[in-house]
Amino acid sequence: MPLGTTLWYYHKVEFIESQPFTRKLHRLADDGADQVLRAIQQDLERKPDRGAMVPGLGCVRKARIANPGRGKGKRGGYRYLYLYLETRQHIHLLLLLDKNEQEDASEEQRKQIRHWAAQLKRDAGD
């Protein structure tokens, strides 16, 4: 009897960081930037749609991640806004906020995010 073969495909998502996200990550987390980024990636690899949709931002989601330097858990940590494009398995990390500095995106940031989201979805065919 021939040996059967079963193929399993594990869908990994690709992460794309915006320049504002990366700059803010390195400014806020400094030496812990890689640790924070990896924690975000692990959370989103497990459940890409985990964050709550932000009204008016074109399918952009907002989630929380702990600040390892503060030791206060997710509530006292960072907020990040991202766009998950399921058809392409892309997650665009758009903005990172420190709760102590800014809890929500400013109107100017929201305008930029709406523009990015529309452009990214259009480019992806979503």
Question: For each of these PLM feature ranges, what is it?
Answer:
Residues M1-A39:
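Arg/Lys-rich, positively charged N-terminal/basic patches that mediate binding to nucleic acids
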Residues L28, K47, L120-A124:
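Solvent-exposed amphipathic alpha-helical surface segments
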Residues L3, L83-D126:
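Enriched for short, Lys/Arg-rich terminal
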Residues H26, Q41-E45, R114:
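Generic solvent-exposed, charged/amphipathic alpha-helical segments
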Residues G32-A52:
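Compact soluble domain cores
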Residues R50-L96, E101:
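Basic/aromatic recognition patch in beta-strand/loop cores that engages polyanionic ligands
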Residues E17, V36, I40, K74-G77, ...:
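Amphipathic alpha-helical interface surfaces
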